[in-house]
Amino acid sequence: MVLFPPSNALFPALSPAPFSCILFPMQKKIAAINDLSGLGKCSLYADISIASAMGIEVCSLPSAILTSQTGYRDYCCTDFTYQISTYTEKWSNLGLSFQGILSGFLASSDAADEVCEFLERFHSKGTLYLCDPVLGDNGNCFFTLGERQTAAMRKLAARADILTPNLTEFCLLYQASYEELLRQTAGDTEALAEELLSIYRHARSAEAVSATDDRSSTDEAQTVIVTGIPSLNRNTGEKEMVNLILNQAGIIGRSSTKRHGAEVSEQGTSYSGTGDLFAAVVLCDLLCGRKIEDAVRLATAFLSRSVADTVREETDRNGGIHFETHLSMLLPESVPPTRPGDLL
């Protein structure tokens, strides 16, 4: 099929500017290494939806295929670890390159080694790697994973430019006690932030001493965003969710949003896919040229609106959140709004 420039005689509502004068920036491309779940609106479903809305091409590499995400009582998981090396080889043969790489759920500890090989080939200078270390929630490691998987994920976390753990995953990665951390800080977000920073600095210093892989992210380069921390606003007394942004230098930012009723239980259990959506928005917004603090604020606002709709409809948490109707929040600023006359 051959497509010709539109004729103003046929479509008078279109702009009179010559077709050849319309210039578009080169589309950016990310590799998304994540599972594909038939139910739950998470992982690759989230990655593809977010990146596409933000004008970024997604090259999908499934780490596993599931009938539903693992929160459902009955599901089947097909491990695709053995295929990761095939994707690496074939994409390398095709000469592909990426502006961003995102990794999420891995079905086995061996998958981390395969992703490391992928990074060896594609995580070049100028490529931003975001690791969303899917390990656990509510103080517990997911039952499908174990210490070997956690140790494997630490290797990827050390290489990431951006790391987006929830509080449980942060503790698992840096071998801190979740319960003791909450007990010591007693709901004080400022105290918790300082404790997280101390744990992170200590862990990174230990990594620097024992590091044999010179491809690990430098202290200055890596940014960690600890997501979904339940908190209490001192001024209003309202329950909030806080995201802390830190690096080796200190706490560099934070964002907070009101907790919407059943959005998060007292135990911290959240809706399926929120971490995936958050990570995808942050990575894509950074690739669009925004600062990390702005990217986190956008992701927080997007999730807040989506969760509010989901709570109103009393959707089961395993089903994910109703984010699709809010994707317009993520459209690139360079794209003009559609006018009524543009649609025939």
Write out the residue ranges for each language-model feature.
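Short, positively charged and aromatic/hydrophobic N-terminal segments
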Residues: 10, 18, 22-23
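Conserved N-terminal subdomain of the carbohydrate kinase-like
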Residues: 27-143, 324-344
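Short pre-catalytic strand/loop immediately N-terminal to key active-site residues, enriched for Gly-Thr
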Residues: 38-39, 252-273
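Conserved phosphate/ATP/ADP-binding segment of small-molecule kinases
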Residues: 144-252, 264-267
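Short, small-residue alpha-helix embedded
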Residues: 171-172, 268-292
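Charged C-terminal helix
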Residues: 293-344
